[in-house]
Amino acid sequence: MDKQSTFQDPKEKHRIQRDVKLSRPRKRFSFLDYVVVIFLTVVAFCVRAQRLMNPAKVVFEELRYYNYAVDYVNNKLLMDVYPPLGKLLFSLVAALTGNKYELNTLDEPGQQYPFTDVAYSMRLFTCLLGSLLVPLMYGTVYFPTKSKTAASLAALFVIFDNGLITMSRYIMIEIPALYFMSLTAFYWSVYEAQQKRPFSLRWHTSLLSTGVALGLALSTKLSAMFTFGWLLILAAFHLWNLLGDLSVPMYRIVKHLFSYIFYLIGVPITVYLAVFAVHSHIAYKASVADAFLPPEHRHALAGNRFDDQFADVAYGSLVTIRNAIPEHGYLHSSELLYPEGTEQQIISLVDEPNQNALWIIEHEHSQDNNRSNIELLKDGSVVRLRHVMTGRALHSHEHKPIVSNNDWQLEASAYGGFGFEGDANDLFRIQILEKKSKHATSNGTVETLNTKFRLIHVFANCELMSSHRRFPDWGDYQREVTCCRNCVERSTTWFIESNYHDGLPSDSRKITYRKPGFLESFVEHNKLMWLKDRKMGDGHVYESSALTWPLLLGPLRFFYEQHLQVFFMGNPFVWYSVISLVAFFVIVQIFCLARWNLGYNDFGPSAFHYNYNIGKFVVAWLLHWAPYILETDRVFLYHYLPALYFGIAALGVSWSFLGNAVFGNRTAYKALSVIIMALMFLVYRLYSPFTYMTTLTKSSCRALELKGSWNFHCNTYLDNLSDYKFSSDAGETYFEKAAPHPFVYSEDTAKKSEGDTPLNKNLNDYYPSWDQRVEAGYKLAAQQKAEQEAREAAEKAASEAAERSSSEAAASSSSESVAAASVEAERLAMEADEFNGASETVDGASVEAERSAMEAAALNNAAESTEVVGSSPESVASEQEENVAESAQARVE
């Protein structure tokens, strides 16, 4: 009786029917399914394609991908941090709709598209891929739920999300990448529907299709690695369940394991390699992007000719020296001087070799600089690098560099000139790096192209280094070179690219760059992608933290013109529904886990089925969102779209579960579904002016700023809709530029110094002029030395003449003193005669006469002594006074 009543219970009967329905494998869509899918896809396309060329100008990162497509059409190499498939697809559209010889790259965002039919076709292609997300979402939800209502609801969420619509309207790589990720999820859902029939043809084809789709996703954008990780987790979960099923023999588990390895690892890698093979076949011509490639890869491109070079490097060789980091370029100098500090000649790096990148290797002792005596460079050789065009030597000293200005770095400069041998601060020691010199000979000598070495300053013990900084305008924005202590080896590694020595026999061994194979080029390209992805520029005004994405805290403005704007803005109803579901699912899992620990089992077959399928999409949401939390540079709101897609899939499966487990009345369930669809459509319409760049009033715009972090720049719009009809003001054009790209040169870096003329292929052409300048320099130095010696001799003669003139002046002064003393003596003698004749004053006169006579005698003696020995004026005067006194005394007597 109880058993019969149980089967008559409507809820229990519905549960049993549901479990049977979910366990039955679904072979194909029904006719009604196809009708629904086609209808929804057409609606999605119409929603995305309206006003597609509004604006008909370059928007945000369209510039990058449009130019990439043009480069592919012209068979030029391009470098990007993303794999090539998405750009190849854009180039295919451009090639089919445009003239190869008329397509040119564009300069900046906001620029008018020269050929609107090409741009329209490329945007239409993105629009088509965005529309195809709808049938993929429908199938992804339908296969695990068998619910048309839930699948349709999820598809409508994709159709009317403003963010997905916006990204589907522009030439950007996000939608192609998302399309292949969603294709991977779709085929995995098809595969899981075949679990009851393992190793059948449909089982193999669905798993193979999953691997192919995953390979295409990885070939479009590396963020598909998150999808790859998600599939590995699901495959491991399936294997774990098989291990727990004792009815499954071990050989079948091993077959499952090898099937997963082949289809989910081997097939994607094969597809990835195939895409790069197509890329290498199409992009075979040289371009500005090849500066980032290692030299052997760069010179393998058409248009980059490189002549054979002498293998042996000797003193007297004329060389160009290149840093091991490809984009850092060639050691260079010119007439530019540091504006402060030592004010010596600047040492820098340039992207392309030119005459100012030529150096001649001199011996540390000038008397050994004889090119006819060939002495090869080896490990430990001490050299002086002389700049060919200016004659100055590479130099370093205890001065901090102006730009880097670090204590562990010293300034590198060029010092001296032709005819100046230089000083000890010009000397550098060569240290060969054996591990990096893979293809060099093992005889310990320096070999062109193959030997990697350091240049170590002999006295400062610092290493010549390529800096990551650039000079400002006074240094023509060239890359700085310093001499550093304890720095990164890669920045201090150099090699000689061009080498010529007129003393070497013409039949001497010569070498050139070897041509790398496909796998080597593949590895190098991917290594550059991974490395450069870590150096994506200086950020952007609209980059945001991934923690804010699920709550849609900040819209991203793409474009503004004539009081109209384009924003990347998601549908708040869709985005908040997704994050609410994720939060609710986590809470339910915690609650069920707590009950399970208490001995309760809340998971029957149906509940477990839904819990697994909701959980797998929540895990996908987490894997496609959480890694961006660790990123701090160049992360934008639209990077959340893959996570949003999987969140919508989880939402669709959850809605099916609610319909089966909660709503006993199917009519109420479907009515509520219609209400949700209507609310979603209403919110889409409210924010559509930001999607399609249509008119909006200031007041309506402000009403849409529901959160404090939303800023729609509402003052951009006019006060009334009628004002747009009469407004002749075109307004200011505004566009957001993408952040600087690591594989794109800025305009500043393209500047060249004066004298940076192209380098002749035959370096021997520079030897005659070099020898002439050296000879002229030494002649000038000898002439300057002779002139200096003549100046020194003249100065010495002038000094001696000045001394003689001073002595003669002193003697003349002494003669005048003697004459004055004689006059005084005669006067005293006359006075003495007068005293002699006066009898009444004889005694007093005698005393005075004696004194006067003594003074006169002293003066006379001094005068005689001065004439004989040339005494000083003071002594002469004293002796003269004594002589005069003696004479006067004699006369008195």
Curated annotation (Swiss-Prot):
Enzyme Commission code: 2.4.1.109
Pfam annotation, one family: PMT
Residue stretches making up the MIR domain: 310-364, 374-433, 443-499
Family annotation (PROSITE patterns): MIR (PS50919)
Enzyme class of the recorded protein, top EC level: transferase
Transmembrane annotation, as ranges: 29-49, 77-97, 124-144, 147-167, 170-190, 224-244, 258-278, 573-593, 610-630, 643-663, 671-691
Pathway entry: Protein modification; protein glycosylation
Keyword Glycosyltransferase tagged: yes
GO biological process, one term: protein O-linked mannosylation
UniProt entry tagged with the keyword Kinase: no
Protein location: Endoplasmic reticulum membrane; Nucleus membrane
SUPFAM superfamilies: MIR domain
Composition-biased stretches (Basic and acidic residues): 786-806
Spans annotated as Disordered: 785-893
GO molecular function, one term: dolichyl-phosphate-mannose-protein mannosyltransferase activity
Composition-biased stretches (Polar residues): 868-878
Residues with Phosphothreonine modification: 451
Reaction it catalyzes: a di-trans,poly-cis-dolichyl beta-D-mannosyl phosphate + L-seryl-[protein] = 3-O-(alpha-D-mannosyl)-L-seryl-[protein] + a di-trans,poly-cis-dolichyl phosphate + H(+); a di-trans,poly-cis-dolichyl beta-D-mannosyl phosphate + L-threonyl-[protein] = 3-O-(alpha-D-mannosyl)-L-threonyl-[protein] + a di-trans,poly-cis-dolichyl phosphate + H(+)
Lineage: superkingdom: Eukaryota
Glycosylation positions in this chain: 370, 443, 665, 720
Protein task: Transfers mannose from Dol-P-mannose to Ser or Thr residues on proteins. Required for normal cell growth and septum formation. Shown to actively O-mannosylate wsc1.
Family membership noted in the UniProt record: Belongs to the glycosyltransferase 39 family.
Protein name (record): Dolichyl-phosphate-mannose--protein mannosyltransferase 1
Organism this protein belongs to: Schizosaccharomyces pombe (strain 972 / ATCC 24843)
